[in-house]
Design a protein with these regions (language model features):
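Class I SAM-dependent methyltransferase SAM/SAH-binding core
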Residues: 51-86, 91-94
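A short, conserved alpha-helix within the catalytic core of class I
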Residues: 114-127
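Conserved Class I S-adenosyl-L-methionine
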Residues: 176-239
Length: 239
């Protein structure tokens, strides 16, 4: 798994200094649910290239970003230097082996497979006084990937958000939750879209031959570019 995320790092979304429209809505909802980051210690589990980590670093007192991918962390540290962010600690580790021996003001994790099961979720709960967790509410729709899934079930989808929500109910842990939706288009060159599709298909256990993928995408390309429509539904848990 580490190798897959290392491979993705070069083309993964990076911190630009400003949150996207979707992320602004996410942060507004987190604030509405009572979490404040000002002057707080934060840990970001599965931080990737630091899109959230670096934004929060500009608000909080200190933040630790943990990820299994050294290449992802390298990108995050490059962007931290670019934006003069110095209150950041990067830790390369999987979540099961991450043992900071402290409790943070806020434990934060968005769209990361690092928190994989109930044992991990309990560990996540114990990491923070407040916790913010975001995961898929249902499988993401991609107009490009649908060309290759051909109606097959995506075995990689894990309904963790609803499972963890039920855990909070069982344990009588008060929480707020909501579903956030996003619809967008992504335009890439034929080669970029080919490599992106191959990565997503491989991680979903739908491996396809590279030339076949490129040929299929060539048939829908316009002037050397392919436009992908993406529809996402995510569940936010704040507690």
């Amino acid at each position: 798994m580490k190798e897959m995320w290392d491979k993705k790092a070069a083309s993964y979304t990076r911190f630009t200094g400003e949150p996207s429209v979707f992320h602004r809505g996410l942060y507004a909802k987190i604030t509405e649910f009572g979490v404040k980051f000002e002057n707080k210690s934060v840990v970001d589990i599965g931080c990737g290239t630091g899109v959230h980590t670096l934004f929060l670093a500009q608000i909080c007192r200190e933040i630790t970003g943990i990820d299994i991918s050294g290449e992802m962390l390298k990108v995050m540290l490059e962007d931290a230097a670019k934006f003069n962010i110095s209150n950041l600690t990067a830790v390369q580790s999987d979540f099961k082996n991450f043992n900071p021996n402290r409790v943070y003001d806020v434990a934060f994790s968005t769209m990361s497979p690092a928190i994989a099961d109930e044992e991990d979720f309990v560990k996540f709960i114990n990491l923070g006084e407040k916790r913010v967790y975001l995961w898929w509410n249902k499988p993401r729709y991609s107009s490009v990937l649908e060309l290759f899934y051909e109606g097959s079930q995506r075995g990689c989808f894990k309904e963790k958000a609803n499972f963890f929500e039920e855990y909070l109910r069982r344990e009588n842990i008060a929480f707020n939750s909501c579903v956030l939706e996003e619809s967008r288009e992504q335009k890439r060159t034929l080669e970029e879209m080919t490599q992106n599709a191959l990565w997503h298909l491989e991680i979903a256990n739908f491996t396809h031959e590279e030339n076949a993928v490129r040929s299929r995408l060539q048939s829908i390309a316009q002037d050397g570019y392919v436009t992908e429509k993406i529809v996402s539904s995510m569940k936010l848990l704040v507690f």
